[in-house]
Structure formats: structure tokens, C-alpha cells
Amino acid sequence: MQTIYLVGGAAIDITGKPENVCRERDSNLGKVQIRVGGVAHNIAKRLAALEYDVELVSAIGSGFHAGMVRESCQKANVSLQHTLACAEHTGTYIGVYDEDGDMLVGISDMSVLDNLTPDYLSSILPQINASALCVIDGNLTPASLDYL
């Protein structure tokens, strides 16, 4: 079976939802969840669950959060052979929701993906071109999106 390549984000998603009406500019009691996410990561896990061979091309840091991404992918049978380990922190998304679950604000720091440069992507382009399918998420730089 040919491999499906996913190029883009693998991140840590941190979400919070208050128990009651959210009070702005104040601390609110509620629930906070931390889990592995990112567009490309999430799609890769779903495809692997359908028993496709999946390769995630991303960039992650070297700390605790990177370990969470690696463990998530390993458990899901998602290959990280072409994922870069970088000095920066792993991409992070923070979402704050209201008591009904509607988003109040989201902040995304996916700057680690700046390491997926056209030069790096050119080194794995033969594998990508030979794949059954390549899915690219919109978190890459414009230059990398144009290259692919």
C-alpha cells in the first residue's frame, strides 16, 4: 500500500471552559484540557485508524510537548520519519470557550512550522510525489505552500 503524506501542524491544544458565565479580565473556575492536535496530525490519526500507511511531515520542539506528539503518533501508527525536531517549542493552540462551548478567543503559535522550508521539503519531494496522496494544511509559510 502506498503511503499518504500529511504536511503541516502537529501541536498541543489547550482548551478552557468556565463552569459558569465567563467573567472577562478575571480568573474563572472551569475545566482545562490538554491534548495533541494540529490539522495534519488530526487527519493523519484518522487515516491511520482506517489502516492507511501514513507519514506526518511536521516540525516539533524537543521538550515535553514534543514527547506528547511523538507518543500520540506512535500509538496511532503514524510515522514521523520526516518530522523535524527543532530547538523551538512545539506548536501550541489555546482556546477559551464560554459556558455554552462557543469560542471566545483562540491563540495559535505554530511558528515552529517555519522550519518546513522549501529547501527541506525539496529533500523529501521524491517521496511525496510517489505517495498515494498528499494533504497539506494551511499552517505552512506562503513560500512552502507555493513550493508544494
Language model features with spans:
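Short beta->alpha linker loops
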Residues: 60-61, 89, 140
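Ribokinase/PfkB-type carbohydrate-kinase core domain
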Residues: 1-10, 71-85, 95-148
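Glycine-rich phosphate/adenosyl-contacting loop at the front of the ribokinase-like
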Residues: 1-59, 64-68, 74-78
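A general structural signal for well-ordered alpha-helical segments in protein cores
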Residues: 40-44, 66, 91, 104, ...
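Short, basic and Ser/Thr-rich N-terminal targeting/leader segments
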Residues: 50, 88-91
